[in-house]
Amino acid sequence: MDESIKKLPDLAIADLIFTVKLEGKTGTESYNKLIKEIETHKMLPLYKILVEQLKWTEDQGLVSKLKAENESELKALDNKITDSVENFGESEIREAYLAKSDFYCRIGDKDTAVEMYRQTFEKTVPLGQKLDIVFTLIRMGIFWMDHDIVTRNLEKAQSLVEEGGDWDRKNRLKTYEAVYKMSIRQFKEASDLYLETVASFTSTEFIDYSRFIQYLIFTSLLHLDRVSLKQKVIDSPDVLSVINDTPKLQDLLQSFYNGDYANFFGALAHFSDSIKGDRYLAEHSRFFTREMRILAYNQFLESYSSVKLESMSNQFGVSYDFIDRELSRFVAAGRLNCKIDKVSGVIETTRSDAKNHLYKTTLQQGDNLLNRVQKLSRVINV
């Protein structure tokens, strides 16, 4: 990571907040870590928000300590701005304003930070420095999951990049955009962005590489066809270098691709449960489980014109009743291209609408071509 890029705000703190909210109680290891981070970064505004949201008993001693530290630091920052305005040039004035903006961002005063960054942006000339401010605002928006801040600044960053942003910042923007799109269930767009940036990943101020690869696999499983999944993910040296950092992720990917459905179901259950603790993926856990089951069922059924329910249940390592209920539900919803004969216990596969349309179109085009050949033949004979 470029040393000039600060972890600001520190998104690991947002992860801690999410975990503490899930646990729903104080005194846990996560809670104690969070309080330590709040104290270290002097995050009084954030602490007050959490006290109100989570109904904590306010620690008056901590509040008094953080208030005094914030006031002292703010006074020094204001003095620095005054000194820069009176004695130095535009560059020093900008740096003083940036320091004050970073202060408000760090302590968790979102609204004041946004306003200070706006003022700093107006005093900034170099394109790269403007982009760095916008990137900080995107990270801050994602920290708070403030969709307005994120979307406005993603658009602004895109506009600035089109003016001539450097290669590294263009890639950085794609990573930020990928994570945000994934968080709002735009998985295909996120997958494309992850795959574009995997070989040139540098955004460690935002997300660590192992987690980036986990998200790449998560989105790619949902949207890539088998050939692309093999080429771009399974055989990717970048993916292989860290895939085992996430338990069961390798099993999930390989068992799905290889049609090892019993192991796939076990790995899917483990992975889906683990992402319930991820602030970006938690609300998509059930969706992912359902969609991956549908993909696996369709992949299995593509190999057969008909297959017994009992055979399929054995392949997936589940009971006959489970597979019967599951398939019936997805067939009724139009998600599986098959019919179930309840009497004989047989599944009969059918062409998808897309394949039916292609089949009919091909026949129609063939008929039209045949008619034209016959007409031409009659003309020649005459």
From Swiss-Prot:
Q: Which UniProt keywords apply?
A: Proteasome
UniProt domain PCI: residue ranges: 186-354
Going by the entry's taxonomy, the superkingdom of the source organism is recorded as Eukaryota
Keyword Cell membrane found: no
Query: Which GO biological process categories is it annotated with?
Result: proteasome-mediated ubiquitin-dependent protein catabolic process
Q: Which is one Gene Ontology cellular component term of this protein?
A: proteasome complex
Q: Which GO terms describe its molecular function?
A: structural molecule activity
InterPro entries listed in its UniProt record: PCI_dom, Rpn7/CSN1, Rpn7_N, RPN7_PSMD6_C, TPR-like_helical_dom_sf, WH_DNA-bd_sf
The record describes the protein's role as: Acts as a regulatory subunit of the 26S proteasome which is involved in the ATP-dependent degradation of ubiquitinated proteins.
Q: Which family does it belong to?
A: Belongs to the proteasome subunit S10 family.
Protein name, entry field = 26S proteasome non-ATPase regulatory subunit 6
The coding gene here is psmD6
